[in-house]
C-alpha cells in the first residue's frame, strides 16, 4: 500500500490543566503509564522513554496475556507547545506513522490537537477512537 492510500487523523481535546502539565505528562513514565496505550483489561508492563530529539520510547501493555508494544522515536520536543514522534505497533503493522501534538493555551487551561499521519485506512476508526480515549484518560489523570 502506498503512502497515498493512507489517511491523516486529527483529534482535539480541551484540558483544564496548563500547557506545561499536559505536555510533561507525555514524557513522564510515571504519568504516561496511567493513560497512554492503556486498555480497560490490560496491564502496563513497561514504559521506557528517552525524552530527547532522537530518543526512543517503548510502551508495552499486556492484553489477554499477550504483550503489545508501542514504539517510536521523538523527532521534535518543543515544551510546552509541540511534540512530534514516529509511531508503530509492530504486532499489527510494521508501517511507521507520525504523530504531532500541538498545545495552545486557552483561558486557564489549554487545547491539545493531535494529528496522526499515515494511518492505514482499515485502522482509521479504531485509531481515532483510541486517541480520543487516550486524551480523555490524560484529562482524568491531570
What is the meaning of each model-derived region?
Residues 13, 47, 70-75, 97-104:
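Hydrophobic/aromatic beta-strand elements that line small-molecule binding cavities or substrate pockets
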Residues 3-7, 49-51, 64-68, 91-95:
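A generic structural micro-feature
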Residues 5, 16, 77-79, 106:
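Structural motif
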Residues 84-133, 138:
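Beta-strand/loop substructures that line and gate deep hydrophobic ligand-binding cavities in soluble
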Residues 43-86:
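Glycine-rich portal/gate segments that line the openings of hydrophobic small-molecule binding cavities
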Residues 6-12, 44, 56, 69, ...:
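Intrinsic-disorder/low-complexity, polar/charged segments enriched in Ser/Thr/Lys/Arg/Asp/Glu/Gln
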Residues 1-42:
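Hydrophobic ligand-binding cavity/cleft-lining segments
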Amino acid at each position: 500500500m502506498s503512502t497515498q492510500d493512507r489517511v491523516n487523523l486529527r483529534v482535539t481535546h480541551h484540558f483544564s490543566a496548563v500547557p506545561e502539565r499536559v505536555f510533561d505528562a507525555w514524557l513522564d513514565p510515571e504519568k504516561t503509564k496511567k493513560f497512554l496505550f492503556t486498555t480497560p483489561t490490560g496491564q502496563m508492563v513497561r514504559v521506557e522513554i528517552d525524552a530527547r530529539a532522537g530518543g526512543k520510547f517503548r510502551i508495552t501493555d499486556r492484553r489477554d496475556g499477550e504483550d503489545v508494544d508501542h514504539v517510536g522515536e521523538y523527532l521534535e520536543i518543543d515544551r510546552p507547545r509541540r511534540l512530534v514522534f514516529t509511531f508503530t505497533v509492530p504486532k499489527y503493522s510494521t508501517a511507521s506513522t507520525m504523530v504531532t501534538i500541538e498545545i495552545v493555551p486557552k483561558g486557564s487551561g489549554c487545547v491539545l490537537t493531535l494529528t496522526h499521519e499515515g494511518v492505514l485506512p482499515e485502522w482509521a476508526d479504531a485509531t481515532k477512537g483510541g486517541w480520543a480515549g487516550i486524551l480523555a484518560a490524560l484529562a482524568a489523570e491531570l
